UniProtKB/Swiss-Prot annotation:
UniProt-listed InterPro entries: RNase_H (IPR050092), RNaseH-like_sf (IPR012337), RNaseH_domain (IPR002156), RNaseH_sf (IPR036397), RNaseHI (IPR022892)
UniProt protein name: Ribonuclease H
RNase H type-1 domain boundaries: 1-142
Cofactor dependence: Mg(2+)
Any single GO CC term annotated in Swiss-Prot or TrEMBL for this entry: cytoplasm
Region annotation (Disordered) ranges: 135-159
Keywords from the UniProt entry: Cytoplasm, Endonuclease, Hydrolase, Magnesium, Metal-binding, Nuclease
Gene: rnhA
Binding site for Mg(2+) 2: 10, 134
Subunit structure: Monomer.
Length: 159
């Protein structure tokens, strides 16, 4: 039987694009772990995605997961849109390329071995764990330590 894990995630960006960070809480029985990291230049959607990715990648074994996010972009993307994107070689219905494809591919791989139920909560509405993740993400964004190479590469492609 797989371990039952709760994951809560949030991303933050001070400007969009701008310095950003993610925050995640992983809970298994009475154990809780927090994850956060800040990036010099990124977007809010990239941080929302990265929060879920890093949390899932932190799990050593296949788990049964309830993942709660305040990002419809992440929830809809992974539960609905990704199937069509993959069929169209990572293009949207209008033939334009999917944004953040590096992270969508990474998230797609991260979910493979888990059974995940995706939940959405309204951000800044008093959901305790979401508020804590928001605080972690904002603090990380205010003290960035890493480059978001995927974001930087996507910007170079535009020039």
């Amino acid at each position: 039987m797989h371990k039952q894990v709760e994951i809560f995630t949030d991303g933050s960006c001070l400007g969009n694009p701008g310095p950003g960070g993610y925050g995640a809480i992983l809970r298994y029985q009475q154990h809780e772990k927090t994850l956060s990291e800040g990036f010099f230049m990124t977007t809010n959607n990239r941080m929302e995605l990265l929060a879920a990715i890093v949390a899932l990648e932190a799990l050593k074994f296949p788990c049964k997961i309830t993942l709660t996010t305040d990002s419809q972009y992440v929830r809809q993307g992974i539960t609905k849109w990704i199937h069509s994107w993959k069929k169209r070689q990572w293009r949207k219905a209008d033939k334009s390329p999917v944004l953040n494809v590096d992270l969508w591919k990474r998230l797609d791989k991260a979910i493979e071995r888990h059974e995940i139920e995706w939940h959405w909560v309204k951000g800044h509405a008093g959901h305790d764990e979401n508020e804590r993740c928001d605080e972690l993400a904002k603090a990380a964004a205010q003290s960035p330590t890493k480059e978001d190479t995927g974001y930087l590469e996507s910007q170079q492609d535009k020039t």
